[in-house]
Amino acid sequence: MAHIYRLLLLLLSNLWFSTAAQNQSETEWPLHDNGLSKVVQWDHYSFQVNGQRIFIFSGEFHYWRIPVPELWRDILEKVKATGFTAFAFYSSWAYHAPNNSTVDFSTGARDITPIFELAKELGMYMIVRPGPYVNAEASAGGFPLWLMTGEYGSLRNDDPRYTAAWTPYFANMSQITSKYQVTDGHNTLVYQIENEYGQQWIGDPKNRNPNKTAVAYMELLEASARENGITVPLTSNDPNMNSKSWGSDWSNAGGNVDVAGLDSYPSCWTCDVSQCTSTNGEYVPYKVIDYYDYFQEVQPTLPSFMPEFQGGSYNPWAGPEGGCPQDTSAEFANLFYRWNIGQRVTAMSLYMLYGGTNWGAIAAPVTATSYDYSAPISEDRSIGAKYSETKLLALFTRTAKDLTMTEAIGNGTQYTTNTAVRAFELRNPQTNAGFYVTFHTDTTVGGNQAFKLHVNTSVGALTVPKNEGLIQLNGHQSKIIVTDFTLGKRTLLYSTAEVLTYAVFENRPTLVLWVPTGESGEFAIKGAKSGKVENGDGCSGIKFKREKDYLVVNFSQAKGLSVLRLDNGVRVVLLDKAAAYRFWAPALTDDPNVQETETVLVHGPYLVRSASISKTTLALRGDSVEKTTLEIFAPHSVRKITWNGKEVQTSHTPYGSLKATLAAPPDIKLPALTSWRSNDSLPERLPSYDDSGPAWIEANHMTTSNPSPPATFPVLYADEYGFHNGVRLWRGYFNGSASGVFLNIQGGSAFGWSAWLNGHFLDSHLGTATTSQANKTLTFPSSILNPTENVLLIVHDDTGHDQTTGALNPRGILEARLLSNDTSSPPPEFTHWRLAGTAGGESNLDPIRGVFNEDGLFAERMGWHLPGFDDSAWTSENSATSASSALSFTGATVRFFRSVVPLNIPAGLDVSISFVLSTPTAAPKGYRAQLFVNGYQYGRYNPHIGNQVVFPVPPGILDYQGDNTIGLAVWAQTEEGAGIQVDWKVNYVADSSLSVAGFGKGLRPGWTEERLKFA
């Protein structure tokens, strides 16, 4: 049958590149299911749930990058408020498996059942992506770091050692998910196997020569998922258009999933766009990619599905401060997401919708602490223009039911009266509804182009606007012009203004249209004969012209909201873009496929989280950040409005809406960061230091399973000894004289190291944004050498394990070779090495925060960063009584600073707080600093490398109604020492249903005496 579908595809392609015809015969595409259930089905057009088609507009968030479960509601309510029908998340094997005998889905933020329950409550489908490999700019791509020794093979294959390693985690994840599937009335829609594993073929995929190892691996994963209760469709995501893996339309070679998908980052997944040239070619802003031909060639009988489409980009070390939001701005969201619709995509998930924070040692070396990703929801949880721009399209796709079943009829400049503008015509073969997606012919050009559009409608061919004005594309912009758009029992014949949404109250539709501020629009409603202006806020030039079967309305909309009423019962709300940004359509149902009778319309607030109606009362939950006028379009039965549980005084407008005023939230002032104390955190540099305690391990392996053996022995790879994160300390002993040492150390991009001999500082590798391995020859001054035993201390950090095939790249000392000026005899050798890292190693001493939270610094091993530690004997820093602290010291060492600061944030507010770290102008920059908040490492600040200075810390990590322990570990890599300025600030205050005061109880365990043994 495949050749028949490809023949049909060829015929469709001819239509696609030809001038549009009004009608197209409907092609009979096969309807697929996975043989286990018919609840979820799919075909050439879209996914279906219980026989209903749905446009899947989804966005990614990572629960492990915001380890406060109460805040998952905040993120997911903001996702729902955009109009998204789904969300996606990677699970992290590493986050749940601190060692090879533990899988933890119950402790603290590792219990993910609230996510599944929220999906059901809020009414969104889930795309669950368990890995076992996820990439995600996570250390080792989400693999647990105990897997990095080489003893489990080369990974991501059918090696029995690797299979035995991933099976417990993957089985647990599948079993948890199995309780929350669409097939059982819950909300998991699909289950992704592996991640960007485009390895099905050896050589050119067109030759279809299967990679049997990769096929066997995928079949093992699929079997495990099914054996552990997964009945929803299994999916995959190709990393690019070249690999063509795991789709049954392409081949039946083995290992195929039910629905294959394609990932795409047309503007580059990182702020360093040079990293994407091998995939995307030369970077040209706003250059688009053709996906239609790919999907028609590779999976013509499946939906055009993009499990990852660019929602932003991560900021690498030394990237611009604050990332590169200009690369994936609101304009990007406007153009590229509409482009996908023009390409007939009906299922796409934005990566990321909320990025979060690489707290602790979660990150791969490619990025620093922030994982803001320039996503629509910022790292500090605020929403802005990009979020609002995304919402304009998501609400449209939720309400445009005919968009879930379209054929591509044609594209080109022949649709317009301006050759600088082209259009793509999509048409529903059953209803004849049309969607004309318009762009600049050259999308990289952002000028202002005006045009008319040739469309086919149920009343014949028209050129619109008919009466006056032109359609405008101003800047990097796209517009979707609809024809024969269903409004309940009415029909929008066409509109040059974009549809935001519509609702039906008492069998009468309320249509919401928007245009950029100051632009004009024209629309036509079938069956209407006359109309009137009921509210003309900002609207001018309104004209009604009756045609034979429809009424044409022209308008120009400045700032504001206007309301028109037509004689056939249609109410039309006209918005400019600014007003549309503050317009919401909260659902009254927990069904993700929201119908037009199951929503209300709200204008004004910063955020509307939810709505429900009980008798005559409409209960709204949301956020207000300023004094706001609330306007509501709802059923006539609604007489009272509550906002966050409190009734608000309302008034009725002549055109049927309700209005109320929301007060501004109070200002929040943070207390001063003063009363700092400090202590030395590098006693290990001293010869008198005793390293015989349980914090230290003898590093004595003479063989390794790692595929990259060291140049000298013993093996000094930290992972071999169970220490996987950040800073590690090596003490190498030797007897007699040596003139120096050659050291070659590997720790990932932006890593650094320092060395001391017998307590005397030698030198450091400060690190660069791109250097992952650094060697130096250090000279030993004869004055500090002992004739007998000498101790060389090496302190090095790493910035995480590399991703994909680089995951096994070792972290530690690749070569340590003593040197001698005496050429008559061999140079001395190290007698033995001792190693210290995270307190307890893989034993997971702090299961709430987890093994990624701590490094091996003395301060961390001793628990100085934890609440409740007694620092009364420490040195007082006597900071100035202001909202900042300047902390400094001289000498190459590590010093730990600590302060306890109370907060008393009132209930009923959502407050976001960030720390700001900076280096005073005259202070040295050759240092590394780590920020700790109530025991959590929430910032890595390297002023000589990276540009991140703002570190958001969420409520729940911060105690908003109690004392907060703030710590700074500062590692000076030169004798000049270090100077650091510490501030904090309020990002926003919202009167909110999300009352964050009191969040995080149980997430901030305190200091215990057990820490003392790790000195």
From Swiss-Prot:
Q: Which GO terms describe its cellular component?
A: extracellular region; vacuole
Q: Does the keyword Glycoprotein apply?
A: yes
- The lineage's top-level taxon is Eukaryota
Stretch forming the signal peptide: 1-20
- A Pfam family found in this protein is Glyco_hydro_35
Give any single GO term for biological process. polysaccharide catabolic process
Recorded catalytic reaction(s): these are: Hydrolysis of terminal non-reducing beta-D-galactose residues in beta-D-galactosides
Coiled-coil stretches:
none
**Per its UniProt record, what SMART domains does this chain match?**
BetaGal_dom2
Question: Glycosylated residues?
Answer: N23, N99, N100, N172, N211, N411, N456, N554, N679, N735, N775, N821
Record keyword Cytoplasm present: no
Q: What Gene3D superfamilies does this protein's entry cite?
A: Beta-galactosidase, domain 2 (2.102.20.10), Beta-galactosidase, domain 3 (2.60.390.10), Galactose-binding domain-like (2.60.120.260), Glycosidases (3.20.20.80)
- Where found? Secreted
Where mainly located? secreted
Question: Which residues catalyse the reaction?
Answer: E196, E308
List the keywords (alphabetical): Carbohydrate metabolism, Disulfide bond, Glycoprotein, Glycosidase, Hydrolase, Polysaccharide degradation, Secreted, Signal
* Cystines in this chain: C271-C324
InterPro entries cross-referenced by the UniProt entry? Betagal_dom2 (IPR018954), Betagal_dom2_sf (IPR037110), BetaGal_dom3 (IPR025972), BetaGal_dom3_sf (IPR036833), BetaGal_jelly_roll_dom (IPR025300), Galactose-bd-like_sf (IPR008979), Gly_Hdrlase_35_cat (IPR031330), Glycoside_Hdrlase_35 (IPR001944)
Q: What is its EC number?
A: 3.2.1.23
Family in the record: Belongs to the glycosyl hydrolase 35 family.
Q: What is this protein's function per UniProt?
A: Cleaves beta-linked terminal galactosyl residues from gangliosides, glycoproteins, and glycosaminoglycans.
Q: Which PANTHER family match?
A: BETA-GALACTOSIDASE RELATED
Q: What is this protein called?
A: Probable beta-galactosidase B
